[in-house]
Amino acid sequence: MAKYQVTKTLDVRGEVCPVPDVETKRALQNMKPGEILEVWIDYPMSKERIPETVKKLGHEVLEIEEVGPSEWKIYIKVK
């Protein structure tokens, strides 16, 4: 069973800043409150920047899950 009921998945693996940050913001703009965005990243700096951006926008980071060496999933709840 899935941890979260993901509404949308964004895969920005292979991209470096600022692309993952910009694409995450763009995806969140098109989502409704209560929906969950799952973001796949492999750029370590994005693991720090995306949560900062998300919080500034007023959304909630539910979890940052390490899924492999230098690979993470960030779960974001739209507020």
Swiss-Prot record:
Protein origin, superkingdom: Bacteria
A Pfam family recorded for this sequence: TusA
InterPro entries cross-referenced by the UniProt entry: TusA-like, TusA-like_sf
Active site: 17 (cysteine persulfide intermediate)
Family in the record: Belongs to the sulfur carrier protein TusA family.
Annotated protein name in UniProt: Putative sulfur carrier protein TM_0983
